[in-house]
Swiss-Prot record:
This is Keratin-associated protein 13-4. Keywords: Keratin, Repeat. The keyword Repeat applies. Residues 37-82 are annotated as: 4 X 10 AA approximate repeats. Sequence repeats lie at residues 37-46, 47-56, 57-66, 73-82.
Amino acid sequence: MSYNCCSGNFSSRSFGGYLHYPGCNPYSTALCSPSICQLGSSLYRNCQKTCWEPTSCRKSCYRRRTSMLCSPCQTTCSRSLGFGSSSCHSQGYGSRSCYSLGSGSSGFRFLKYGGCGFPSLSYGSRFCYPNYLASRAWQSSCYRPICGSRFYQFTC
C-alpha cells in the first residue's frame, strides 16, 4: 500500500484501485516523493514523514509508541480531500476518529475504533481508509462517503 501524494493518487494492492484527489499538483514531487509516502513497517522506525494532505503535500510526522498495542500514529489532520472537506483522525488502540465529509459540511462525524479493529459508521460508505491492526498488518476499512463525495467506489 502506498501514497503517491503529489500525483493525487492513492493506490493499494489490497483492494486494487485508485482514489483521485482533484486539485493536486502532479508536478510537486519535490515536496512529497512516493518514497516518503510509503506505508509500511519502516514508517514506524524513529520518526519518518508521510503525506496526509495530497493537495499541498504537507508532511506529517508519526512517532513510535511502544506502549500502543496497535498503531503508534499520533493524531493528524488533513484538508482538501478532494471536495473541500477536512478530516482529523487519531489512530491507536481504542481511539476515536472524526471526519468532516462532503461539500459544505461544517460538523464532524464521529466514529469509534473498537479496540484495534475496523471502525463502524452510522451512515455507511465505500471509500477505503488504511487501518493498522494489532496483527501489525495494513488492512483497509470500507466507508461509504455521504452525498457529494468524489471518492471512487470500491468493494473491499
